[in-house]
Amino acid sequence: VGALALTVAGLGVVVLAGWALDQERLTRVLPGLVTMQPATALDFTLLGLSTAMLHLGWARARVPEAVPLLAVLTVVLIAGTGLVTELAGWRYPITVLGDMSQNEGRMSGITAVAHLVICVSLLAAVFGRRLVAHGAGVLALTLGVVGLSGYAFGASDLYDVGYFQTLALHTALGIALLGLALVSASGEVGLTRLARSGTVGGRLARTLLPAV
């Protein structure tokens, strides 16, 4: 869990550095692909650190719970603003360093939804709602895998699908990694319990998961 969370936080920091230093390879990965917007990178940094602080024992012992909660609420504000302004057709106010030619500088709609789902999982974990945290983690993982699958079959096809139009490759990867971290951190519930069981369903799940 910690390795996945800190990897995503590091991804956010690297992309923010790419914007600050005008290094397109860090923000876009490959020519022709969409960029990860600064707001998305900031969200990833906050979400990755929050996941680590809430789910790692040594971090929980040293960091007041209010710190990750404040980070999560900041993400809710950023992602919620992006989603609401896109749905309402309003001007997006957070445009610092952003690519204004791409969705007016805002993160993609599916990215905003995924970040809000991750926030739900983290908040549910804080309040002891393990099944809710697990379910939200599974949903985030699914959204990330769908995005990665779209790139596997061709970015041009993915960009034709609604709110996936401005989903960056490394954004999809970050969502999938955080979703996997949250599913792993939620304990023996839901899909995790099934995958670890000795039943026929468990054996089938363990067989299919690598293929997925």
Identify the residue ranges that each predicted region occupies:
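Non-catalytic regulatory/interaction regions at protein termini and inter-domain linkers
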Residues: V1-V212
